[in-house]
Each structure stands twice: as structure tokens, then as C-alpha cells.
Amino acid sequence: MTHEEQRIWLIKELQKDRSQLSHYRIPNDEQGQKDLLRGLMNIWMPKPISEEYLRIESEYLRAENEAKGITKISDLTPVEKDLYLWQGDITTLSCDAVVNAANAQLLGCFRVLHSCIDNCLHSAAGLSLRYRCFEIMSEQGHEEPTGQAKITPGYNLPSQYVLHTVGPIVSGRLTEEHCELLKSCYLSFLKLAEENGCESIAFCCISTGVFGFPQHKAAEIAVSTVKEYKKQQAAISR
């Protein structure tokens, strides 16, 4: 199959899961097709996936991700020793692990074409990521608590792992509890990363979007927590 044929095949396979969308016309333009495929992935309910689908999806998504351009840690300039500040698409970073700011269900974002990091990572990684999260949550039997972390493979992402953490929601005045919970997010995924042999981690701004955590304070907590952890644990180098 050509890249376009793979995209159309994937769309048709996912349309089979939604009877009301099975006769939805596939757009003729490339961007329209990409948006439809991503939208179908966004609303996909987790269930076992065929090997054929996974193979074609993997070939397609890896080509898409490579076309965006992969950024390696070695391409970046540290602001301090082994500490980097980078603005860009985290789905294009090649490192041991990237951090996902997840919600308590831990299944990814179901809002079609939403721009949150949860949606972007799941869309670039493929359906296997949602299914693995579903297995983890089914075994756990309850929502993911704030301040903890889970780890999954990165699947079709350039990074080996995804670390999922649920940040605190600030709906009113910022409290000390909010700050401690955010710090716990960083400590939890740093510890989990170390346990899985990760040396380089890329993390987004946790809780600073719709969760309402003040950005400046969140950045202070992130940097200070990482620095403190690195002093005690040398395994996480970057």
C-alpha cells in the first residue's frame, strides 16, 4: 500500500466500529483524511486490535511522525548542566520517556482533534497506547489518583516510554496541597522512570492548561523538584 492507501484503509477499518459513521464520505483532500483518521482514533473505545491493523497503523504513524522531523536530546542546548528548556511538539522528541498530563480515567482524550497533550500523544502513538492504558486501569479497578504515575511503551512515538500522571486541578485559590500534589507528580514519574532504566525524560507543563495551575509557580515546582531529585539519584541524567 502507498501511504495514502494506508490512511484510507485505516479510516475504513475504524468506521466499521461506528455504524453511524460507516457511510461517512471520506474527504478527497489529504488534510481532511488526516483529520478524519485522527478523529476516529480519538473516539475509539478500547478493545483487542487485529495484528493487520496494528502493522499498517504502525507503518503509517511512524512515517507521519518522521515527516514532522525527529528532535534528539543531542540536538538541544542545555540551559544548565543536563537540564533543557525546549518549546515544540513533544511527540517528535526522541528520548527515553515523555510525560503525559493525563486525566483520572487515563484512557486519553476523547474530544475529536483536541489540542491537549493527552490527545496529541495518543494520536501519534496509535491505538495500542489507549488499549494498554485500558488494561492497566481495568486491573487497577479505580481512577488514577492525583500525583501518582503509570508507565507504558511509547509504541509509534520516537520515545521508548510514556509516563502518565494526573496533575491537581486548581479551580479557586492555589493551596499548599495543590503544590504538594504537583510535586508528587514529578517525583512519581521520576522514580518510575528510574526503575525502568530511563536516563532522559521530556515533560510538559503539568496542570497549567485546563487544570488551572498558575504557570509561573508550576514551573518553579517542576524545576526545583527535578533538581532536588537529580542530586539524590544520578540515574536520570537529562
Task: Locate each region found by the language model.
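Macrodomain-like recognition of ADP-ribose-binding/processing modules
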Residues: M1-R238
